[in-house]
Each structure stands twice: as C-alpha cells, then as structure tokens.
C-alpha cells in the first residue's frame, strides 16, 4: 500500500516549540513502518527559533 506523503506536506500541524503551541507546515515527511507493525507518517518541522523537531502526523492502517 503506497502512501502519498505530499498530502501531509501541504497541511499545518500544531507542534510545541519552547513550551508554545505553533502551527507549522512540515519541511519533510516520510513513512516509518517497522516490520510486522502498523506504520506512521513522521514530519520534520523547523521552529521559528531555529530548532528542528520530529512529530508523528499520520497513521497508516
């Protein structure tokens, strides 16, 4: 089952940057699916202060 990660790149998500919730679009997104388990879509976000963080932004059934 192929997942289109492009659809995740166009949405904004709430992420926590230095204790504040900020709405950001991911810089990059990829699928993380360990063997024998359901997968998740991980997004890479760049906070306004320069920090980068990862967050699960979707589930694969």
UniProtKB/Swiss-Prot annotation:
What does UniProt give as GO cellular component? chromosome; cytoplasm
Localization: Chromosome; Cytoplasm
Q: Name one GO molecular function term.
A: double-stranded DNA binding
Complexes and interactors:
Monomer.
* Modification note: Methylated at multiple sites, to varying extents.
Originating gene: creN7
Signal peptide feature range: none
Domain of life from the UniProt record? Archaea
- Classification via InterPro entries: Cren7_sf (IPR038647), dsDNA-bd_Cren7 (IPR020906)
Q: Which family does it belong to?
A: Belongs to the Cren7 family.
Query: What keyword terms does UniProt attach to this protein?
Result: Chromosome, Cytoplasm, DNA-binding, Methylation
Gene3D superfamilies per UniProt:
Chromatin protein Cren7
Q: What does this protein do?
A: A chromatin protein, binds double-stranded DNA without sequence specificity. Constrains negative DNA supercoils.
Chief localization class?
cytoplasm
Family annotation (HAMAP family): Chromatin_Cren7
- Protein name stated in the entry: Chromatin protein Cren7
Pfam families the UniProt entry points to: Cren7 (PF11520)
